[in-house]
């Protein structure tokens, strides 16, 4: 059985104390003597010690020497126990240095635009006025006779990305079979409600722009829709017949902000 060489012989194979040289494949290089004992004794008895300079040393050479010494020791010893993961981990931790891996990600990249949940519904204000598309981009509130109830707008209410708080649920309101969504924009200094045409290949989506998003709040048997972009501004109707639906800031007054919602079957 092969025997482990004496530590002094192992050291002399790589280091000359007299000339302060570290011998490499390409020839000797002058180095200042500053040595350290590296202990591989965790593998068992018969420790092997290796002297390596801390200044101007070749890191790759040190790794090669470490591997050679470790493997020679493993080959030369007859182990009483099975080689375990901890033994390999001890060798690898001696050879390699751990460095943290930093991942840089953008929160926007983490947003998932998977299938958007939505429901179809109709809205009437508390005065039972229906919402009707009067022209391509104008939504009005008026009383409809029973034979004209088919004129009522059917909304596709999508549940979108946003903060849910105080029973307020972020939603977007699109018109069924139309590429139109209710949105809030500022005209002058006043927030205004409008119908905005969108690309059907893109909308609806989970991460809707804030101008499209409203907080839906249920109050008894009615619902309110508050603009996320302009807090305390609500989808409103007028007491006057056939007036456009608008964005108002007064609740419980002349402006009507509460609606009855009828959910339709899929």
Swiss-Prot record:
Listed PROSITE patterns: INTERLEUKIN_1
CDD domains: beta-trefoil_IL1B
Any one GO cellular component localisation term in the record: extracellular space
InterPro entries: IL-1_CS (IPR020877), IL-1_fam (IPR000975), IL-1_propep (IPR003502), IL1/FGF (IPR008996)
Propeptide residues per the UniProt entry: 1-113
Site (Important for interaction with integrin): 168, 178, 187, 201
Family statement drawn from the similarity comment of this UniProt entry: Belongs to the IL-1 family.
PANTHER family, alphabetized: INTERLEUKIN-1 BETA, INTERLEUKIN-1 FAMILY MEMBER
Physiological role: Potent pro-inflammatory cytokine. Initially discovered as the major endogenous pyrogen, induces prostaglandin synthesis, neutrophil influx and activation, T-cell activation and cytokine production, B-cell activation and antibody production, and fibroblast proliferation and collagen production. Promotes Th17 differentiation of T-cells. Synergizes with IL12/interleukin-12 to induce IFNG synthesis from T-helper 1 (Th1) cells. Plays a role in angiogenesis by inducing VEGF production synergistically with TNF and IL6.
Disulfide bonding pattern of the chain: none
Superkingdom of this protein's organism: Eukaryota
Protein name: Interleukin-1 beta
Gene: IL1B
Subunit structure: Monomer. In its precursor form, weakly interacts with full-length MEFV; the mature cytokine does not interact at all. Interacts with integrins ITGAV:ITGBV and ITGA5:ITGB1; integrin-binding is required for IL1B signaling. Interacts with cargo receptor TMED10; the interaction is direct and is required for the secretion of IL1B mature form. Interacts with HSP90AB1; the interaction facilitates cargo translocation into the ERGIC. Interacts with HSP90B1; the interaction facilitates cargo translocation into the ERGIC.
Localization per Swiss-Prot or TrEMBL: Cytoplasm, Cytosol; Secreted; Lysosome; Secreted, Extracellular exosome
Misc remark: IL1B production occurs in 2 steps, each being controlled by different stimuli. First, inflammatory signals, such as LPS, stimulate the synthesis and promote the accumulation of cytosolic stores of pro-IL1B (priming). Then additional signals are required for inflammasome assembly, leading to CASP1 activation, pro-IL1B processing and eventually secretion of the active cytokine. IL1B processing and secretion are temporarily associated.
Keywords: Cytokine, Cytoplasm, Inflammatory response, Lysosome, Mitogen, Pyrogen, Secreted
GO biological process: cellular response to lipopolysaccharide; cytokine-mediated signaling pathway; defense response to bacterium; fever generation; immune response; positive regulation of cell division; positive regulation of immature T cell proliferation in thymus; positive regulation of T-helper 1 cell cytokine production
UniProt organism field: Ovis aries
């Amino acid at each position: 059985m092969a025997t482990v060489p004496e530590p002094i012989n192992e050291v002399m194979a790589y280091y000359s104390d007299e000339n302060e040289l570290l011998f490499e494949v390409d020839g000797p290089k002058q180095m200042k003597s500053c040595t350290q004992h590296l202990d591989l004794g965790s593998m068992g008895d018969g420790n092997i010690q290796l002297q390596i300079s801390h200044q101007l040393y070749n890191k790759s050479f040190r790794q090669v020497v470490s591997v050679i010494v470790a493997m020679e020791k493993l080959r030369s010893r007859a182990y009483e126990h099975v080689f375990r993961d901890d033994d390999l981990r001890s060798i690898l931790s001696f050879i390699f240095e751990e460095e943290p891996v930093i991942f840089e990600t953008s929160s926007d990249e983490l947003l998932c635009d998977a299938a958007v949940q939505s429901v179809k519904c109709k809205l009437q204000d508390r005065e039972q006025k229906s919402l009707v598309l009067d022209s391509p981009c104008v939504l009005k509130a008026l009383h409809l006779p029973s034979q004209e109830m088919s004129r009522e707008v059917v909304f596709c209410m999508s549940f979108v990305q946003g903060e849910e708080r105080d029973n307020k649920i972020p939603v977007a309101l699109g018109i069924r079979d139309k590429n139109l969504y209710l949105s809030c924009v500022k005209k002058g200094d006043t927030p205004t409600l409008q119908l905005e045409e969108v690309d059907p290949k893109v909308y609806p989506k989970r991460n809707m722009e804030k101008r499209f998003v409203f907080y839906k709040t249920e109050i008894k048997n009615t619902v309110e829709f508050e603009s996320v972009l302009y807090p305390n501004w609500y989808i409103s109707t007028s007491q006057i017949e056939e007036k456009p639906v608008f964005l108002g800031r007064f609740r419980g007054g002349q402006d009507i902000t509460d609606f009855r919602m009828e959910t339709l079957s899929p």
